[in-house]
Amino acid sequence: MSAIVDIIGREILDSRGNPTVECDVLLESGAMGRAAVPSGASTGTREAIELRDGDKNRYFGKGVLRAVENLNTEISEALMGLDAQEQTFVDRTLIELDGTDSKERLGANAMLAASMAVARAAADESGLSLYRYFGGSGPMSMPVPMMNVINGGAHANNTLDLQELMILPVGAASFREALRWGAEVFHVLKKLIHAQGMSTAVGDEGGFAPNLANHEAAIQLILKAITEAGYEPGTQIALGLDCASSEFYRDGKYTLAGEGGVSLSSQEFANLLATWCDKYPIISIEDGMAENDWDGWKLLTDQLGKKVQLVGDDLFVTNTRILREGIQKGVANSILIKINQIGTLTETFAAIEMAKRAGYTAVVSHRSGETEDSTIADIAVATNAMQIKTGSLSRSDRMAKYNQLLRIEEELAEVASYPGIEAFYNLR
């Protein structure tokens, strides 16, 4: 039987040493699922609310005992006896139980932990890998990894405003090969940074955080690493940026400390990004405008939307209501998918499906505060999202996802495909 007979929530620590929620779900058949939720550093204001204790005497207010208590009481009571195979009904029960748009009463962290653990228990009972449980038995695409090799912004303590500078192995023949290419570039980049006398310590997501003169210096350093690793920039390995622009948008201006403190209008910032795209093989820009600068987003989309993937993260926060508005207004051409921004798997899958129907791409993503949980790897494959963003080529919390993707590709064998540049179908 698939009936839920026990739910156990607990407080664990994430990759930054901050508390997060883990949940075990036990079924009548003896099957069990365990899941842990991530947490972000730069968060959109419209994200579902993760419940924190606020007790400054314990983890500086970041404890999650209230969320855990909600899991072990209200959520447990509501889900007890439900069929774990009925994911949509389970998630709808959670949403109705919380009763708020932002999931602030029970906490999106508590709700997501339950949603994920139920799915894992159901997959375990079915004898299926999680990606097969979600995605069925047909052919599947492995995702192109967006590898964050230089960190800035809220993810690092350096002079760069942009949060992530990424490499995308679009010319590889398989995910395994793409991962190898990325790892080789990462190690060459480390040597180049060290040779310049800069620190090779890594940031929250495993990328380097050197103090460079400006953003173009960072881009040029990455291109040099790609070339010295033996690869062709652009055709084999392209570049991506996560600007996280909301972090440096104030009073209608984008103020870039890493560019000499210049303050730019939306049009001027769009022009700067367009200039970089003309000079360098940049094919993806995330949060190129601030989450509330919809006019700026429209300018950027009109200017670059036919040749560059424009990903809405803080803009859309994995929310179908906001995504629908963006599609209607012709804003962006891609959505970043973060499961903890919305709080249930059902709503996550709905956002991916809505994006695809509109010709937008969907990039499944980690958060800067992660755990060893690798659910997003299975989601990326199961939904044929074809892109994943899960950090650099270091830190075991990031490698957990990459290694799971290696296992999935091995298991799929000849029915796995690697789309490469075709993953960017929004640019055709």
Swiss-Prot record:
Give me the residues that bind (2R)-2-phosphoglycerate, please: Q163, K338, R367, S368, K389
Task: Give the main location.
Answer: cytoplasm
Gene3D superfamilies (UniProt xref): Enolase-like C-terminal domain, Enolase-like, N-terminal domain
- Give the cofactor note text: Binds a second Mg(2+) ion via substrate during catalysis.
| Pathway stated in the Swiss-Prot or TrEMBL entry | Carbohydrate degradation; glycolysis; pyruvate from D-glyceraldehyde 3-phosphate: step 4/5
- For the keyword Cell membrane, the answer is no
Entry-linked InterPro entries: Enolase, Enolase-like_C_sf, Enolase-like_N, Enolase_C, Enolase_CS, Enolase_N
Disulfide connectivity for this sequence is: none
* Enzyme Commission number: 4.2.1.11
- List the coiled-coil residues: none
Q: What does this protein do?
A: Catalyzes the reversible conversion of 2-phosphoglycerate (2-PG) into phosphoenolpyruvate (PEP). It is essential for the degradation of carbohydrates via glycolysis.
Protein family membership: Belongs to the enolase family.
Q: What is this protein called?
A: Enolase
Q: Which organism is it from?
A: Bordetella avium (strain 197N)
